[in-house]
């Protein structure tokens, strides 16, 4: 599919849907006692019906607040909102009360979509006289999704959308004060999808793509990832919880998984503690696995003896580790903050390929990422072909391209402070090495996200 000729995220979904087998499994929530797996056909039917209901409740260009945990209905609602002519405003389920109050006032949504009573109660006092749709029945005069799905109606696709129009407003915490609403366009996210598809092509060719989603879909990184999943025709599993993530990986057997640096830090800590408990031949084999794995990562040649040792490391250590993560993992992709170089080297060395990338919400969000064929863990990889990166005289990383945000919602001055002559000033200091790989060396100011991707 030529993404550069796609006009909107809605068009991306429906064009892909027309090319895949309609009975092909698509979305599954790994919630206890939940065995429902939606096919592409079933998801599409739900999108049509929810679109019809939303159209009745909003005008073109209205904001629709989406507050829910990760689940198939989140995906369905996002596509339906845009198909109905609305702008999705996804928000975290973990915000403080003041943040909910501020965001609701700032974006002034015409419609609110919530998953259940737990989420509704977080915003209840701030949404007087607002129209509400709920995924589950709640203690309010909302329209439950189950009622909407019983209705028949048109099966229409919005062909009025174009790449320059707002697709979503994603609120980012920054470093101080209230969250800023980052307005991302259809074209900005599509541009990111195009860059990601080129990056992932070698992995897609090896195995049918399967993703396990656990990072909140309200996060710009995971929000864009769901459209990459559409583009490459992936099967998507929604994790039960962070605590059950490893168990869920055994169920989903993902081929690709995206996460922020905090996840990899925690993973590194847990595996390191386990390694430290080992003694004797096991400990020696583990040490050799790390040592030789790092050597291979840096494209250094192994001696004959080292090749023999590495053969056993692969069979007895790396294969066992890979099996704990479902056995099909081809790559972890780290984004939304800087990944420690030692952690990146360690994970790659023990058989968990980890590609470090760089981005920020204001860039839709990915700017660069390491390649599956060339991993340089001291860098964040080469910039996506779909955006331009240059280093300013003071060392600041500047980004230009369709992926750059339309601006901050209701904040022209703040927008003008970070976008100058078409270049997004990231607030990060960096350099580009002789191979064209971007390296982050310092931070000029706190525009970029932290290790948790916030």
For each predicted feature, which ranges?
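Conserved AMP-binding A3 loop
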Residues: 37-41, 167-193
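Conserved AMP-binding/adenylation subdomain of ANL enzymes
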Residues: 190-213, 217-311, 315, 328
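Conserved ATP-binding/catalytic segment of the ANL
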Residues: 383-450
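Conserved AMP-binding/adenylate-forming core of the ANL superfamily
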Residues: 26-58, 62-71, 75, 79, ...
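Structural core segment of the AMP-binding/adenylate-forming
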Residues: 56, 83-147
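ANL superfamily adenylate-forming
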Residues: 118-163, 271-320
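Conserved pre-ATP/AMP-binding loop-to-beta segment of ANL
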Residues: 23-25, 152-171, 178, 204-210
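Conserved structural elements of the adenylate-forming
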Residues: 44-52, 182-203, 319
């Amino acid at each position: 599919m030529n993404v550069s000729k796609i006009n909107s995220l809605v068009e991306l979904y429906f064009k892909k849907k027309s090319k895949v087998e309609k009975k092909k499994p698509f979305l599954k929530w790994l919630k206890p006692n939940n065995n429902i797996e939606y096919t592409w056909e079933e998801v599409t039917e739900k999108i049509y019906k929810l679109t019809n209901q939303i159209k009745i409740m909003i005008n073109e260009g209205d904001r629709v607040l989406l507050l829910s945990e990760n689940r198939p209905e989140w995906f369905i609602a996002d596509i339906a909102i845009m198909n109905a002519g609305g702008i999705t405003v996804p928000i975290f389920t973990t915000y403080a009360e003041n943040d909910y109050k501020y965001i609701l006032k700032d974006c002034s949504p015409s419609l609110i979509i919530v998953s259940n009573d737990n989420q509704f109660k977080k915003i209840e006092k701030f949404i007087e006289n607002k129209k509400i749709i709920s995924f589950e029945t709640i203690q309010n005069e909302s329209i439950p999704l189950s009622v909407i799905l019983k209705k028949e109606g048109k099966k229409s696709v919005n062909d009025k959308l174009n790449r320059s129009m707002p697709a979503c407003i994603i609120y980012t915490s920054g470093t101080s004060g209230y969250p800023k609403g980052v307005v991302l366009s259809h074209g900005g996210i599509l541009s990111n999808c195009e860059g990601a598809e080129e990056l992932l092509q070698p992995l897609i060719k090896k195995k049918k793509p399967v993703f396990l989603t656990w990072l909140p879909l309200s996060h710009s990184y995971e929000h864009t990832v769901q459209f990459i999943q559409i583009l490459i025709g992936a099967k998507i599993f929604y994790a039960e919880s962070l605590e059950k993530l490893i168990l869920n990986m055994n169920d989903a057997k993902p081929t690709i998984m995206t996460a922020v640096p905090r996840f990899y830090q925690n993973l590194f800590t847990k595996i390191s503690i386990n390694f430290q408990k080992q003694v004797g031949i096991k400990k020696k084999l583990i040490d050799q696995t790390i040592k030789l794995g790092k050597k291979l990562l840096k494209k250094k040649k192994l001696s004959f003896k080292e090749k023999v040792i590495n053969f056993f490391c692969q069979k007895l250590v790396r294969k066992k580790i890979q099996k704990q993560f479902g056995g099909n993992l081809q790559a972890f992709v780290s984004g939304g903050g800087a990944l420690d170089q030692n952690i990146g080297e360690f994970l790659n060395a023990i058989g968990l390929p980890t590609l470090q990338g760089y981005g920020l919400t204001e860039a839709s969000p990915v700017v660069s990422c390491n390649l599956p064929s060339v991993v340089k863990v001291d860098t964040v990889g080469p910039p996506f072909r779909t955006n331009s990166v240059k280093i300013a005289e003071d060392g600041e990383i500047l980004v230009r391209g369709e992926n750059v945000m339309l601006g901050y919602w209701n904040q022209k001055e703040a927008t003008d402070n970070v976008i100058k002559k078409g270049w997004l000033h990231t607030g990060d200091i960096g350099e580009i090495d002789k191979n064209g790989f971007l390296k982050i060396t310092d931070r000029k100011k706190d525009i970029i996200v932290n290790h948790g991707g916030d």
